[in-house]
Amino acid sequence: MGVVAKNFPIPDLHRVRRILLSVSDKTGVVAFAQALHATYSVELISTGGTAKTLIAAGLPVKDVSEVTGFPEIMDGRVKTLHPLIHGALLGIREDPSHREAMEKNSIHGIDLLVVNLYPFEETIQSGADGKTILENIDIGGPAMIRAAAKNYAYTGVVTAINDYDSILAELKQHNGCLSLSMRHQLAMRAYAHTAAYDTAIAAWFARDLKIETPSWQSFSGHLESVMRYGENPHQQAAFYRNNEKRFGVATAKLLQGKALSYNNLNDTDAAFELVAEFDPQKTAAVALIKHANPCGVAEGENLKDAYLKALMCDNVSAFGGIVALNQTLDEECAEEIVKIFTEVIIAPDATMAAREIIAKKKNLRLLITGGIPNPRCGGLLAKTLAGGILVQSRDNVVIDDLKLQVVTKRTPTQDEMRDLQFAFRVAKHVKSNAIVYAKNSATVGIGAGQMSRIDSAKIAASKAAESARRAGLTETLTKGSVVASDAFFPFADGLLAAAAAGATAVIQPGGSMRDEEVITAADEQGLAMVFTGIRHFRH
């Protein structure tokens, strides 16, 4: 059994008379301390660099060493880890035994703790060596934060600079007191803060030790936005941002339009990750997404060309979708995009002329990321299950890095090979089972999310035929196309369906028990076929 709690009344309002400040980021701390001291005559206690900053501003500050009677030692590693500090943070003021211990040991309660921690994650991101990173693991700060948060009945704890103003407003409202509600909220934020800090430390140790599956795995993020609802109106939703420095929806700036919904964020992320497969230094590329699946993807001489080719694939599904671009949105492409209803445009940047065109559509959201994510970069993906979390590394295999194997009698032509590689890039981002028909560096038919591969092949061909009819063409778009499959063909039927649709070449991972049967069928149909050796399931 754990510790048995004592039942003492918790005051609704508690006066702030004594405050301890120990901050790594000094932003705003002088003005905050000045307001507290000038308005409420609060006694100020501080440590090291924070004390020097406050003293330099003319504030009367008592160094923590004066309180403890013990100097900072070991290069500042030990300064607040002392009973006179932790007793002041943890003492239950209504408990006679606690009061007796405090009086006997000259412990004076601390009513407000202001701490922000050593910049651990920033130190990692700076490229510092392991020893420097280790030194930037805060010990005393988290210990004090946890102590103060546990004793929120009497002690407030501030861990974020943007809480300074709300604390001053609270004190003004209650004549120098903090309400129980505020102290309780601050405690919750404090424990979330230290949990996130420890999560980052544990993750760094795991990376340093090259442990891919640590015995405990934690994830953290700070609240970025609360949405009106989730995938459906009856579901609650929020977006939390972590510290991964990857260009995308999390780092993007919303230049115009209303706040993004849960589905907007999910679809836009899928769109931008797909278009990032295409190097902006080599080609212009556009991806059109609906329900996290592509309904059109293309490369072109410029973004307008790529957009129109992508739209040709399935202009019905593209209505109300997401448009992702791998280059700066220009005027010509913007003029085409606004011709149909679009939810979101995401691009590395946009010219002023393009922004002016988009601005005419008030509800059209324009996101600017500042760059393109590197598809080769790793990272973790997580999915919650009932009672658990599935974790895997990001699918960061790029077809350019693969050794492709021609397994048929006929070798793909240069144009076919270009289109095969294009189609396989797209198939990586289509929900399984995925079949992608492509021609001239553009998708012409996409079959997604079917339980059988042959159904995906038939649906993709059918949609291509529909698009051709809408465009007034006399022959289907899949004639003379190539086809990509995200996984192997378990039987020859899917490949035969592709051949019947007019495809001339196939790219797939290979690895089926019936590979020879499928290769024989390809040869009989005069198809060229390439194995990649890599599967791209996506669920």
Swiss-Prot record:
Belongs to the PurH family. This is Bifunctional purine biosynthesis protein PurH. PROSITE patterns: MGS. SMART domains: AICARFT_IMPCHas (SM00798), MGS (SM00851). InterPro entries: AICAR_Tfase_dup_dom_sf, Cytidine_deaminase-like, MGS-like_dom, MGS-like_dom_sf, PurH-like. Residues 8-159 form the MGS-like domain. Pathway: Purine metabolism; IMP biosynthesis via de novo pathway; 5-formamido-1-(5-phospho-D-ribosyl)imidazole-4-carboxamide from 5-amino-1-(5-phospho-D-ribosyl)imidazole-4-carboxamide (10-formyl THF route): step 1/1; Purine metabolism; IMP biosynthesis via de novo pathway; IMP from 5-formamido-1-(5-phospho-D-ribosyl)imidazole-4-carboxamide: step 1/1. It comes from Bartonella tribocorum (strain CIP 105476 / IBS 506).
